[in-house]
């Protein structure tokens, strides 16, 4: 399943990120991909050896970790170190699948269950640059407001179309979820949303056994399916 997570960064945060990224050192994006991906990848990434990169990636991690909707949809166990990319002058990234595992600075290795793109450019400021994701439900073309994030299975074929005007800047992350199976994770997310909707009526109708029963079901399923 694909999920739109709005407002991960505020407009003020986005403006500050963009100002700082203007000062960043950019390198060939192929430095972080394998041989197959390098054949279709043509973009730039912030140099991960820079002091600025260390500060920015920490801010992205803090933002996503504090976002309740992101947590509910992803149920993250491990987050990769965020990276930042830039597309301009017809740069693109052809169809590819993300690697199944990635190195992680604390855990050694992590499994990539989910991929996330956090948009940092106003969609009106550039042409092209859509994230195109193919999954079992068809093809999705994504171009979100700055500060919003899209979450999708890492097993999906996806690409970024050529940027023909302006500049597209984004951060991207991989997530190892506590729930490996996409279908089970989606069911838990739907159950969680329904529980939240019912709980919003609690002030009017008070606590009831139905809410407690659903909460019990959610946590028992999470306990049964999670890998910690």
Swiss-Prot record:
EC identifiers of the protein: 1.14.11.-
Domain of life: Bacteria
Domain Fe2OG dioxygenase: 78-177
Species of provenance: Escherichia coli O157:H7
Binding-site positions, Fe cation: 96, 98, 158
Pfam families for this protein: 2OG-FeII_Oxy_3, PKHD_C
GO biological process: DNA damage response; intracellular iron ion homeostasis
Name of this chain's protein: PKHD-type hydroxylase YbiX
InterPro entries referenced in this protein's UniProt entry, alphabetically: Oxoglu/Fe-dep_dioxygenase_dom (IPR005123), PKHD_C (IPR041097), PKHD_hydroxylase (IPR023550), Pro_4_hyd_alph (IPR006620), Pro_4_hyd_alph_FE2OG_OXY (IPR044862)
Underlying gene: ybiX
Comment on bound cofactor: Binds 1 Fe(2+) ion per subunit.
UniProt GO molecular function: 2-oxoglutarate-dependent dioxygenase activity; iron ion binding; L-ascorbic acid binding
Key words, A-Z: Dioxygenase, Iron, Metal-binding, Oxidoreductase, Vitamin C
């Amino acid at each position: 399943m694909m999920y739109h997570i709005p407002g991960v960064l505020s407009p003020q945060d986005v403006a500050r990120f963009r100002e700082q990224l203007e000062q960043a050192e950019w390198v060939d994006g192929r430095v972080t991909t394998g041989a197959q991906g390098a054949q279709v990848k043509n973009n730039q990434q912030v140099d991960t050896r820079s002091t600025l990169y260390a500060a920015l990636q920490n801010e992205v991690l803090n933002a996503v970790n504090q976002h309740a909707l992101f947590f509910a949809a992803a149920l993250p166990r491990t987050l990769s170190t965020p990276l930042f990319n830039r597309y301009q002058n017809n740069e693109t990234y052809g169809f590819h699948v993300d690697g199944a595992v990635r190195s992680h600075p604390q855990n050694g290795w992590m499994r990539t269950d989910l991929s996330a793109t956090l948009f940092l450019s106003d969609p009106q400021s550039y042409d092209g640059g859509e994230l195109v994701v193919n999954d079992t439900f068809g093809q999705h073309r994504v171009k979100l407001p700055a500060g919003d994030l899209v979450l999708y299975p890492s097993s999906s074929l996806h690409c970024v179309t050529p940027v023909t005007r302006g500049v597209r800047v984004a951060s991207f992350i991989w997530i190892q979820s506590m729930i490996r199976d996409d279908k089970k994770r989606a069911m838990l997310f739907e159950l969680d949303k329904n529980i939240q909707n019912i709980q919003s009526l609690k002030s009017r109708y008070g606590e009831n056994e139905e809410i407690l029963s659903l909460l019990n079901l959610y946590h028992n399923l999470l306990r049964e399916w999670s890998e910690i």
